[in-house]
């Protein structure tokens, strides 16, 4: 694989990042949104495991490094404008199916109902017991 060539085809933002959506391969559920830099995307392709870039920590974030909730990557796709990446993943871990740091399946658990945001998906595991 010509690493430089395929990475150069993305439209990186001014900070050298690209937005990434993680989607559960089996169900199509959108699990989370994160960012990647070149190194994170190259590592993800190399390892077959999601590696993101943490803007708050300023470093690579190997999904599941603290929680054990790893994402096995089956497919990496680029949108038509070459500025958004889609990962099709299987969410693995001690409690398979937890992608969100809140202990939920998806980070998109709030729904707008009657003019207010309501949590509509259950907490599968207390986050305090995940992050010790």
Swiss-Prot record:
GO cellular component: cytoplasm
Entry's family note: Belongs to the PRA-CH family.
Record localization: Cytoplasm
Signal peptide: none
Function: Catalyzes the hydrolysis of the adenine ring of phosphoribosyl-AMP.
Organism encoding this protein: Acidovorax ebreus (strain TPSY)
Assembly: Homodimer.
Catalytic activity: 1-(5-phospho-beta-D-ribosyl)-5'-AMP + H2O = 1-(5-phospho-beta-D-ribosyl)-5-[(5-phospho-beta-D-ribosylamino)methylideneamino]imidazole-4-carboxamide
One example GO MF annotation: phosphoribosyl-AMP cyclohydrolase activity
Record: residues binding Zn(2+): 80, 100, 107
HAMAP family hit by this protein: HisI
Cofactor binding summary note: Binds 1 Mg(2+) ion per subunit.
Positions with a binding annotation for Mg(2+): 79, 81, 83
Keyword Nucleus: no
A UniProt-annotated Pfam family: PRA-CH
Name of this chain's protein: Phosphoribosyl-AMP cyclohydrolase
